[in-house]
Amino acid sequence: ASLCILAALLPLQSHAESSADQWQWRATVYLWLPSLGGETSFPPSGGGPSIDVSADQILDSLNFAFMGALEGRKGPWGMATDVIYLDLGSSKKATRDFGIGRIELPASVDADLRLDITGWVWTLTGSYEALSTETFSMDVLAGARMLDLQQDLRWNLNGDISALPLPGRSGSSQVEDTLWDAIVGLKGRATFGAERNWYVPYYLDVGAGDSDLTWQGIVGLGYSFSSVDVTGVWRYLDYDLGSHTPIQSINFNGPALGVTFRF
């Protein structure tokens, strides 16, 4: 398992002068199938060194996702909002894909791990059409992105753990954080084909605030019907929070398929 989304990826085509002062809207629903990576340190409830895990080594399933976007445009001005809810979780048996502080893991020790991650990504932006030709458009945008994330880890250590300064063989820990970041970026599309129904949408933003750095990139291929667009893209969203927080980094990376309704 941001903002502006697939809807924000699809800038509205130029309008006739008679409709230039009217709001034009796009609503998008889409399926995003991201893989997830990042580093998190879970402090044991009974004290001792943290349990360190890499999400990409544990997670392999998306339990539930809701994703949608809304974009409005009036003349060269636009606004967009994008919301994503992710629920990911997975278990791994007899794994050594974890760390315990800076302590070397004994050769006989492995663990059964269960990692669950739930969260919201909400992006809100305003935009201005900086460039528009028959085949290419580009908007500049600014806004904010919110990430609300909760991670739960349960573990059971196997083998001889006498050398490890932990209060017990089993445990659980939870870390959560809510981040707000200001973002700036570009979005647009390049059209091609005899009737210019095919297009390549693109989106890029970068920002900071509660996180040290966040950025998002999207690129893909779309087709416009009379009142509906169908788009397939690759989307990458990354957060770097620094080593001073339990959630040190997290990223979402994968394909998305969206359907946009224009009205």
In which residue ranges do the predicted regions lie?
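Residues on the lipid-exposed face of transmembrane beta-strands in outer-membrane beta-barrel proteins
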Residues: 27-29, 68-74, 124-128, 142-144, ...
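Short glycine/proline- and aromatic-enriched beta-strand/turn motifs that initiate or cap beta-hairpins
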Residues: 15-86, 193
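Transmembrane beta-strands of outer-membrane beta-barrel pores
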Residues: 31-35, 55, 74-76, 83-89, ...
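Residues that define the transmembrane beta-barrel architecture of outer-membrane proteins
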Residues: 21-23, 62-66, 118-122, 136, ...
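Predominantly the C-terminal beta-signal and adjacent terminal strand-loop region
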Residues: 217-263
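Extracellular/periplasm-exposed beta-strand and loop segments of Gram-negative cell-envelope proteins
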Residues: 35-63, 85-120, 147-179, 209, ...
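Short loop/turn motifs that connect adjacent beta-strands in outer-membrane beta-barrel proteins
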Residues: 15-23, 131-137, 192-198, 226-227
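Detector for outer-membrane/organellar transmembrane beta-barrel domains
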Residues: 169-205
